[in-house]
Amino acid sequence: MTLVSGVRTHILDHKLKTAFESASTSFNRRQHILVEVECECGTVGWGECLGPAPINAAIVDQMKNRLIGKNPLDTEMVWLDLYHTYRDQGQRGVTVTAISGIDVALWDIKGKLLSQPISVLLGGRFRESVPAYATGAFRREGVDRISDVVAEVLRYKNEGFHGIKLKIGFNADEDLELIKHVRDAVGPDMRIMIDANHGYDSTEAVAVGRAANSYNIDWFEEPVLPELLDSYNEVRSRQPIPVAGGETWHARWAMKAAIEARAVDIIQPDVCGVGGFSEFKRVVDYAQMNGVRVVPHVWGTGVQIAASLQAIAAIPFAPCRREPLEPIFEFDRTENPFRQAVLKKHLEHRRGTMKIPDLPGLGIEICRESLERFKYKP
Protein backbone atom coordinates (compact mmCIF):
# COMPACT_ATOMS: atom_id res chain seq x y z
CA MET A 1 0.00 0.00 0.00
CA THR A 2 1.30 3.45 -0.92
CA LEU A 3 0.44 6.60 1.03
CA VAL A 4 0.20 10.29 0.21
CA SER A 5 3.59 11.93 0.78
CA GLY A 6 3.14 15.45 -0.60
CA VAL A 7 0.62 18.05 -1.76
CA ARG A 8 1.55 21.10 -3.85
CA THR A 9 -0.39 23.88 -5.54
CA HIS A 10 0.45 25.61 -8.82
CA ILE A 11 -1.15 29.00 -9.50
CA LEU A 12 -1.10 29.92 -13.20
CA ASP A 13 -1.44 33.51 -14.38
CA HIS A 14 -1.78 35.18 -17.79
CA LYS A 15 -2.64 38.78 -18.71
CA LEU A 16 -5.26 38.92 -21.47
CA LYS A 17 -4.67 40.83 -24.68
CA THR A 18 -8.25 42.11 -24.56
CA ALA A 19 -10.35 42.22 -21.40
CA PHE A 20 -13.83 40.71 -21.47
CA GLU A 21 -16.77 40.43 -19.11
CA SER A 22 -19.85 38.46 -18.26
CA ALA A 23 -22.76 40.01 -16.39
CA SER A 24 -21.13 39.07 -13.08
CA THR A 25 -17.35 39.10 -13.64
CA SER A 26 -14.74 41.12 -15.50
CA PHE A 27 -11.60 39.39 -16.76
CA ASN A 28 -8.31 41.09 -17.56
CA ARG A 29 -6.28 38.04 -16.52
CA ARG A 30 -6.76 34.28 -16.51
CA GLN A 31 -5.79 32.63 -13.24
CA HIS A 32 -6.23 28.95 -12.43
CA ILE A 33 -4.87 26.61 -9.78
CA LEU A 34 -3.70 23.03 -10.19
CA VAL A 35 -3.32 20.62 -7.26
CA GLU A 36 -0.52 18.05 -7.34
CA VAL A 37 -0.69 15.08 -4.95
CA GLU A 38 2.27 12.70 -4.75
CA CYS A 39 2.49 9.21 -3.26
CA GLU A 40 5.41 7.40 -1.65
CA CYS A 41 5.66 5.16 -4.71
CA GLY A 42 6.18 8.20 -6.95
CA THR A 43 2.71 8.20 -8.51
CA VAL A 44 1.38 11.74 -8.98
CA GLY A 45 -2.22 12.87 -9.36
CA TRP A 46 -3.45 16.18 -10.71
CA GLY A 47 -6.55 18.17 -9.88
CA GLU A 48 -7.92 21.66 -10.39
CA CYS A 49 -10.05 24.02 -8.32
CA LEU A 50 -12.78 26.20 -9.83
CA GLY A 51 -12.75 29.81 -8.67
CA PRO A 52 -10.25 32.31 -7.23
CA ALA A 53 -6.84 30.69 -7.56
CA PRO A 54 -4.89 32.33 -4.69
CA ILE A 55 -7.71 31.69 -2.20
CA ASN A 56 -8.13 28.08 -3.31
CA ALA A 57 -4.36 27.60 -3.02
CA ALA A 58 -4.32 28.96 0.52
CA ILE A 59 -7.10 26.59 1.57
CA VAL A 60 -5.49 23.56 -0.08
CA ASP A 61 -2.24 24.44 1.68
CA GLN A 62 -4.11 24.42 5.00
CA MET A 63 -5.75 21.09 4.20
CA LYS A 64 -2.66 19.23 3.03
CA ASN A 65 -1.50 18.10 6.47
CA ARG A 66 -4.71 16.08 6.73
CA LEU A 67 -3.76 14.23 3.53
CA ILE A 68 -0.19 13.27 4.33
CA GLY A 69 -0.01 9.59 5.27
CA LYS A 70 -3.50 8.80 3.94
CA ASN A 71 -4.28 6.00 1.49
CA PRO A 72 -5.03 7.73 -1.85
CA LEU A 73 -7.56 5.02 -2.68
CA ASP A 74 -9.68 6.09 0.31
CA THR A 75 -11.29 8.94 -1.61
CA GLU A 76 -14.57 8.84 0.33
CA MET A 77 -12.83 8.84 3.71
CA VAL A 78 -10.55 11.72 2.73
CA TRP A 79 -13.46 13.73 1.31
CA LEU A 80 -15.54 13.36 4.45
CA ASP A 81 -12.61 14.10 6.74
CA LEU A 82 -11.88 17.37 4.93
CA TYR A 83 -15.53 18.38 4.72
CA HIS A 84 -16.29 17.62 8.37
CA THR A 85 -13.16 19.47 9.50
CA TYR A 86 -14.23 22.70 7.78
CA ARG A 87 -18.00 22.32 7.55
CA ASP A 88 -19.00 24.95 10.16
CA GLN A 89 -17.79 27.79 7.93
CA GLY A 90 -17.29 25.86 4.71
CA GLN A 91 -20.44 24.10 3.57
CA ARG A 92 -20.25 25.83 0.17
CA GLY A 93 -17.93 28.09 -1.78
CA VAL A 94 -14.16 27.95 -1.85
CA THR A 95 -13.86 25.30 0.86
CA VAL A 96 -15.67 22.88 -1.43
CA THR A 97 -13.82 24.02 -4.54
CA ALA A 98 -10.53 23.37 -2.71
CA ILE A 99 -11.72 19.89 -1.73
CA SER A 100 -12.67 19.39 -5.39
CA GLY A 101 -9.11 19.87 -6.59
CA ILE A 102 -7.80 17.42 -4.00
CA ASP A 103 -10.47 14.85 -4.81
CA VAL A 104 -9.81 15.02 -8.56
CA ALA A 105 -6.09 14.47 -7.91
CA LEU A 106 -6.78 11.46 -5.69
CA TRP A 107 -9.01 9.90 -8.34
CA ASP A 108 -6.25 10.50 -10.88
CA ILE A 109 -3.91 8.55 -8.60
CA LYS A 110 -6.51 5.84 -8.09
CA GLY A 111 -6.86 5.38 -11.83
CA LYS A 112 -3.10 5.21 -12.32
CA LEU A 113 -2.61 2.70 -9.50
CA LEU A 114 -5.43 0.51 -10.83
CA SER A 115 -4.49 1.06 -14.50
CA GLN A 116 -7.98 2.30 -15.40
CA PRO A 117 -9.43 5.60 -16.63
CA ILE A 118 -11.45 7.37 -13.95
CA SER A 119 -14.65 6.92 -15.97
CA VAL A 120 -14.35 3.14 -15.62
CA LEU A 121 -13.90 3.46 -11.85
CA LEU A 122 -17.01 5.66 -11.71
CA GLY A 123 -19.06 2.82 -13.14
CA GLY A 124 -18.21 2.59 -16.82
CA ARG A 125 -17.84 4.51 -20.05
CA PHE A 126 -21.24 5.14 -21.62
CA ARG A 127 -19.57 6.99 -24.50
CA GLU A 128 -16.13 7.37 -26.07
CA SER A 129 -16.71 10.86 -27.46
CA VAL A 130 -19.03 13.78 -26.82
CA PRO A 131 -20.30 16.65 -28.98
CA ALA A 132 -19.02 20.05 -27.89
CA TYR A 133 -20.50 23.51 -27.89
CA ALA A 134 -18.42 26.70 -27.81
CA THR A 135 -18.53 29.01 -24.81
CA GLY A 136 -17.54 32.55 -25.68
CA ALA A 137 -19.46 35.62 -26.85
CA PHE A 138 -18.45 37.67 -23.82
CA ARG A 139 -18.69 41.45 -23.96
CA ARG A 140 -15.26 42.83 -24.89
CA GLU A 141 -13.81 46.27 -24.32
CA GLY A 142 -13.58 48.78 -27.15
CA VAL A 143 -15.64 46.97 -29.80
CA ASP A 144 -19.21 46.96 -31.05
CA ARG A 145 -20.75 44.10 -29.11
CA ILE A 146 -23.16 42.75 -31.71
CA SER A 147 -20.82 42.76 -34.71
CA ASP A 148 -17.99 41.37 -32.56
CA VAL A 149 -20.06 38.47 -31.23
CA VAL A 150 -21.60 37.65 -34.61
CA ALA A 151 -18.13 37.38 -36.17
CA GLU A 152 -17.01 35.20 -33.25
CA VAL A 153 -19.88 32.72 -33.45
CA LEU A 154 -19.46 32.38 -37.21
CA ARG A 155 -15.87 31.30 -36.57
CA TYR A 156 -17.15 28.63 -34.20
CA LYS A 157 -19.67 27.44 -36.76
CA ASN A 158 -16.93 27.16 -39.38
CA GLU A 159 -14.81 25.15 -36.91
CA GLY A 160 -17.60 22.59 -36.69
CA PHE A 161 -19.17 23.37 -33.32
CA HIS A 162 -22.80 22.34 -33.16
CA GLY A 163 -23.75 25.00 -30.64
CA ILE A 164 -22.76 28.30 -29.04
CA LYS A 165 -23.45 29.86 -25.66
CA LEU A 166 -24.07 33.61 -25.64
CA LYS A 167 -23.37 35.85 -22.67
CA ILE A 168 -26.34 38.03 -21.76
CA GLY A 169 -27.53 39.61 -18.49
CA PHE A 170 -26.37 43.15 -19.31
CA ASN A 171 -29.28 45.10 -20.81
CA ALA A 172 -32.40 43.16 -21.73
CA ASP A 173 -33.16 45.02 -24.96
CA GLU A 174 -29.56 44.87 -26.17
CA ASP A 175 -29.31 41.21 -25.17
CA LEU A 176 -32.38 40.33 -27.21
CA GLU A 177 -31.00 42.26 -30.18
CA LEU A 178 -27.79 40.22 -29.89
CA ILE A 179 -29.70 36.93 -29.81
CA LYS A 180 -31.66 37.94 -32.92
CA HIS A 181 -28.55 38.89 -34.89
CA VAL A 182 -26.75 35.69 -33.90
CA ARG A 183 -29.68 33.49 -34.92
CA ASP A 184 -29.93 35.29 -38.25
CA ALA A 185 -26.19 34.82 -38.80
CA VAL A 186 -25.83 31.14 -37.91
CA GLY A 187 -29.11 29.92 -39.37
CA PRO A 188 -31.77 27.64 -37.90
CA ASP A 189 -29.70 24.51 -37.23
CA MET A 190 -26.98 25.68 -34.84
CA ARG A 191 -27.90 25.32 -31.20
CA ILE A 192 -27.91 28.51 -29.11
CA MET A 193 -27.76 28.64 -25.33
CA ILE A 194 -28.01 31.90 -23.38
CA ASP A 195 -26.23 32.57 -20.08
CA ALA A 196 -27.13 35.60 -17.95
CA ASN A 197 -24.57 34.86 -15.21
CA HIS A 198 -27.28 35.90 -12.74
CA GLY A 199 -27.44 39.43 -14.21
CA TYR A 200 -31.25 39.80 -14.16
CA ASP A 201 -33.93 39.90 -11.54
CA SER A 202 -36.82 37.48 -12.00
CA THR A 203 -39.07 39.99 -13.78
CA GLU A 204 -36.40 40.79 -16.38
CA ALA A 205 -35.51 37.13 -16.79
CA VAL A 206 -39.11 36.14 -17.47
CA ALA A 207 -39.46 38.90 -20.07
CA VAL A 208 -36.20 37.93 -21.79
CA GLY A 209 -37.12 34.25 -21.80
CA ARG A 210 -40.50 34.91 -23.36
CA ALA A 211 -39.04 37.16 -26.05
CA ALA A 212 -36.04 34.92 -26.79
CA ASN A 213 -38.10 31.76 -27.17
CA SER A 214 -38.87 32.55 -30.81
CA TYR A 215 -35.15 32.13 -31.60
CA ASN A 216 -35.12 28.44 -30.64
CA ILE A 217 -32.96 28.62 -27.50
CA ASP A 218 -31.77 25.34 -25.93
CA TRP A 219 -31.53 26.65 -22.38
CA PHE A 220 -31.47 29.81 -20.26
CA GLU A 221 -28.53 29.55 -17.86
CA GLU A 222 -28.24 31.32 -14.51
CA PRO A 223 -31.08 33.79 -15.12
CA VAL A 224 -31.04 35.08 -11.51
CA LEU A 225 -28.89 35.00 -8.38
CA PRO A 226 -27.94 31.46 -7.31
CA GLU A 227 -29.17 32.00 -3.75
CA LEU A 228 -32.72 32.74 -4.91
CA LEU A 229 -34.25 29.34 -5.64
CA ASP A 230 -37.76 30.82 -5.48
CA SER A 231 -36.78 33.25 -8.24
CA TYR A 232 -35.36 30.36 -10.28
CA ASN A 233 -38.65 28.56 -9.87
CA GLU A 234 -40.56 31.66 -10.93
CA VAL A 235 -38.47 32.05 -14.09
CA ARG A 236 -38.84 28.37 -14.89
CA SER A 237 -42.62 28.42 -14.49
CA ARG A 238 -43.36 31.72 -16.25
CA GLN A 239 -41.34 31.46 -19.47
CA PRO A 240 -40.90 28.54 -21.90
CA ILE A 241 -37.12 28.10 -22.27
CA PRO A 242 -35.59 25.30 -20.12
CA VAL A 243 -33.69 26.78 -17.17
CA ALA A 244 -30.14 25.68 -16.32
CA GLY A 245 -27.80 26.35 -13.41
CA GLY A 246 -25.40 24.79 -10.97
CA GLU A 247 -21.84 26.04 -11.42
CA THR A 248 -22.20 28.13 -8.25
CA TRP A 249 -23.93 25.45 -6.17
CA HIS A 250 -21.34 23.47 -4.25
CA ALA A 251 -21.58 19.98 -2.76
CA ARG A 252 -24.54 17.61 -2.72
CA TRP A 253 -26.70 19.63 -0.34
CA ALA A 254 -26.85 22.75 -2.50
CA MET A 255 -27.61 20.61 -5.53
CA LYS A 256 -30.25 18.67 -3.59
CA ALA A 257 -31.99 21.90 -2.60
CA ALA A 258 -32.10 23.15 -6.20
CA ILE A 259 -33.31 19.83 -7.59
CA GLU A 260 -36.01 19.39 -4.95
CA ALA A 261 -37.20 22.97 -5.47
CA ARG A 262 -37.63 22.16 -9.19
CA ALA A 263 -35.51 25.25 -9.79
CA VAL A 264 -33.91 23.96 -13.00
CA ASP A 265 -34.56 21.66 -15.92
CA ILE A 266 -30.82 21.15 -16.41
CA ILE A 267 -28.30 20.91 -13.55
CA GLN A 268 -24.71 21.94 -14.29
CA PRO A 269 -22.26 20.59 -11.71
CA ASP A 270 -18.61 21.47 -12.25
CA VAL A 271 -16.42 18.52 -11.29
CA CYS A 272 -13.70 20.94 -10.08
CA GLY A 273 -16.19 22.95 -8.03
CA VAL A 274 -18.97 20.67 -6.81
CA GLY A 275 -16.64 18.47 -4.74
CA GLY A 276 -14.66 16.46 -7.27
CA PHE A 277 -15.59 13.12 -8.79
CA SER A 278 -16.83 11.80 -5.44
CA GLU A 279 -19.54 14.44 -5.25
CA PHE A 280 -20.21 14.70 -8.98
CA LYS A 281 -21.34 11.08 -9.05
CA ARG A 282 -23.85 11.71 -6.26
CA VAL A 283 -25.28 14.76 -7.99
CA VAL A 284 -25.73 12.88 -11.27
CA ASP A 285 -27.52 10.02 -9.54
CA TYR A 286 -29.84 12.32 -7.60
CA ALA A 287 -30.61 14.49 -10.63
CA GLN A 288 -31.54 11.48 -12.73
CA MET A 289 -33.69 10.10 -9.91
CA ASN A 290 -35.65 13.36 -10.15
CA GLY A 291 -35.83 13.64 -13.93
CA VAL A 292 -33.35 16.52 -14.22
CA ARG A 293 -30.84 16.57 -17.09
CA VAL A 294 -27.12 16.86 -16.33
CA VAL A 295 -24.87 19.03 -18.51
CA PRO A 296 -21.61 19.78 -16.68
CA HIS A 297 -20.09 23.24 -16.43
CA VAL A 298 -16.47 23.45 -17.66
CA TRP A 299 -14.11 26.42 -17.17
CA GLY A 300 -10.39 25.97 -16.66
CA THR A 301 -7.18 24.38 -17.89
CA GLY A 302 -6.52 21.14 -19.71
CA VAL A 303 -6.76 19.37 -16.35
CA GLN A 304 -10.33 20.60 -15.91
CA ILE A 305 -11.13 19.57 -19.48
CA ALA A 306 -9.75 16.07 -18.90
CA ALA A 307 -11.63 15.71 -15.60
CA SER A 308 -14.88 16.84 -17.19
CA LEU A 309 -14.49 14.41 -20.08
CA GLN A 310 -13.99 11.52 -17.64
CA ALA A 311 -17.07 12.64 -15.71
CA ILE A 312 -19.18 12.94 -18.86
CA ALA A 313 -18.10 9.50 -20.06
CA ALA A 314 -19.60 8.00 -16.90
CA ILE A 315 -22.97 9.82 -16.98
CA PRO A 316 -25.63 7.12 -17.55
CA PHE A 317 -28.17 7.50 -20.30
CA ALA A 318 -31.04 9.46 -18.79
CA PRO A 319 -34.01 7.09 -18.35
CA CYS A 320 -36.73 9.76 -18.24
CA ARG A 321 -37.63 9.60 -21.97
CA ARG A 322 -37.67 6.98 -24.71
CA GLU A 323 -34.66 8.38 -26.59
CA PRO A 324 -32.06 9.46 -24.00
CA LEU A 325 -30.63 12.95 -24.33
CA GLU A 326 -26.86 12.78 -24.59
CA PRO A 327 -24.77 15.21 -22.51
CA ILE A 328 -22.76 17.84 -24.35
CA PHE A 329 -19.36 19.29 -23.54
CA GLU A 330 -18.77 22.97 -22.78
CA PHE A 331 -15.59 24.08 -24.54
CA ASP A 332 -14.33 27.50 -23.47
CA ARG A 333 -12.98 29.32 -26.53
CA THR A 334 -11.86 32.56 -24.86
CA GLU A 335 -8.19 33.52 -24.58
CA ASN A 336 -6.74 30.86 -22.28
CA PRO A 337 -3.23 29.50 -22.89
CA PHE A 338 -3.65 27.01 -20.04
CA ARG A 339 -6.33 25.17 -21.97
CA GLN A 340 -3.60 23.37 -23.90
CA ALA A 341 -0.20 24.50 -22.62
CA VAL A 342 -0.36 22.53 -19.36
CA LEU A 343 -0.74 19.24 -21.28
CA LYS A 344 1.93 17.38 -23.22
CA LYS A 345 -0.78 16.09 -25.56
CA HIS A 346 -3.52 18.61 -26.21
CA LEU A 347 -7.21 17.87 -25.81
CA GLU A 348 -8.87 19.50 -28.79
CA HIS A 349 -12.16 19.11 -30.62
CA ARG A 350 -12.47 17.78 -34.14
CA ARG A 351 -15.35 19.40 -35.97
CA GLY A 352 -17.18 19.92 -32.69
CA THR A 353 -16.54 16.50 -31.15
CA MET A 354 -14.28 15.67 -28.20
CA LYS A 355 -12.65 12.26 -27.86
CA ILE A 356 -12.56 11.07 -24.25
CA PRO A 357 -9.10 9.92 -23.08
CA ASP A 358 -8.88 6.21 -22.26
CA LEU A 359 -5.50 6.10 -20.49
CA PRO A 360 -5.33 5.50 -16.71
CA GLY A 361 -6.56 8.24 -14.39
CA LEU A 362 -7.36 11.50 -16.13
CA GLY A 363 -5.53 10.18 -19.18
CA ILE A 364 -3.16 13.15 -19.48
CA GLU A 365 0.47 14.13 -18.90
CA ILE A 366 1.36 17.52 -17.43
CA CYS A 367 3.91 19.84 -19.07
CA ARG A 368 5.92 21.12 -16.12
CA GLU A 369 7.70 23.67 -18.29
CA SER A 370 4.35 25.43 -18.77
CA LEU A 371 3.70 25.43 -15.03
CA GLU A 372 6.94 27.35 -14.60
CA ARG A 373 6.29 29.59 -17.60
CA PHE A 374 2.89 30.73 -16.32
CA LYS A 375 3.76 30.66 -12.62
CA TYR A 376 1.89 33.32 -10.65
CA LYS A 377 4.14 36.06 -9.28
CA PRO A 378 2.24 38.09 -6.64
Model-identified regions with their sequence ranges:
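Conserved, mostly hydrophobic/aromatic
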Residues: V4, V35, G42, M63, ...
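Glycine- and other small-residue-rich loops at beta-strand/loop junctions that grip anionic moieties
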Residues: E48, I99, K167-N171, N197-H198, ...
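Shared catalytic-loop signature of beta/alpha-barrel
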Residues: A57, R210, N216, E227-A244, ...
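Metal-dependent enolase-superfamily TIM-barrel catalytic cores that perform enediolate-based chemistry
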Residues: G123-Q239
